């Protein structure tokens, strides 16, 4: 099944983009574990740094995430210093899989992959990646026919009399497009995964897929279902699932 498929290894014929930074207290839980929303912010930071260093921030400035995969093999904990490596693992003419590996001075290892879509800044629709950026993507992968395939069930299950959990939005949850920021979704995930210490205690995978944006003023509810091996959350607005997240052991 797609959810279980392994992430690609780092390239051997090219050097990934690399950066490092201290693990900050604003990104950790009370037990000093690096939270999922903190991971998301580091992924956003290295994406911006990579775009600036490579120059495609000028030619292809607007990208959105369709999916994020986070594999926590060994969690990071404060205090520590994180080392991030970013490379391109597959692409097509309008989107790309971006891999980021997080390691640390104290032995943390977190592997991630994001499915990024290039948008036209005027229309907000998917658009062709510039030739110069396509050339850059090809430096770390030969896979140039990437297609979208969902890993998670997008439709939320029936309520079945079980209460949803309201998750009020804040103005600080919104990005420049007026959409709920990727990291803010993972604030909601953090609210619920702490109820599954059995999953957090083992190496685990979190996948979140974004179906449609959530905007200011909308009433967001989380619908959660658990089994022995996983926890799944649907982000529901007016009865419609806008995103799905699932966490399970690796």
Predicted regions span which residues?
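HotDog/MaoC-like acyl-thioester-processing domains
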Residues: 2-7, 12-14, 69-153, 210-217, ...
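Hot-dog-fold acyl-thioester-processing enzymes
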Residues: 2-66, 113-115, 119-204
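Acidic/His-leaning functional-site neighborhoods
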Residues: 165-249
């Amino acid at each position: 099944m797609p959810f279980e498929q392994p992430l690609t290894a780092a390239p051997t014929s090219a050097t990934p983009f690399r950066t490092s930074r201290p693990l900050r207290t604003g990104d950790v839980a009370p037990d000093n574990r690096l939270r999922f929303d903190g991971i998301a912010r580091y992924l956003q930071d290295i994406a911006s740094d990579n775009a600036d260093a490579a120059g495609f921030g000028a030619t292809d400035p607007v990208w959105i995430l369709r999916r994020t995969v986070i594999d926590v093999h060994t969690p990071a904990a404060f205090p520590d210093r994180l080392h991030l490596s970013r490379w391109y693992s597959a692409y097509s003419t309008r989107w790309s899989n971006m891999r980021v590996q997080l390691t640390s001075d104290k032995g943390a290892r977190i592997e991630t992959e994001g499915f990024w879509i290039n948008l036209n800044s005027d229309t907000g629709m998917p658009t062709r990646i510039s030739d110069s950026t396509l050339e850059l993507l090809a430096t770390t992968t030969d896979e140039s026919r990437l297609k979208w395939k969902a890993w998670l069930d997008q439709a939320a299950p029936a309520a079945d009399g079980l209460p949803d959990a309201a998750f009020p939005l804040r103005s600080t949850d919104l990005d420049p497009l007026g959409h709920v920021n990727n990291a803010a979704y993972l604030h909601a995930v953090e609210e619920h995964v702490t109820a599954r210490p059995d999953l957090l205690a083992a190496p685990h995978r979190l996948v979140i897929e974004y179906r449609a944006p959530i905007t200011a003023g909308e009433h967001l509810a989380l619908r959660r279902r658990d089994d022995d091996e996983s926890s799944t959350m649907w982000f529901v607005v007016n009865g419609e699932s806008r995103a799905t997240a699932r966490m399970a052991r690796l």
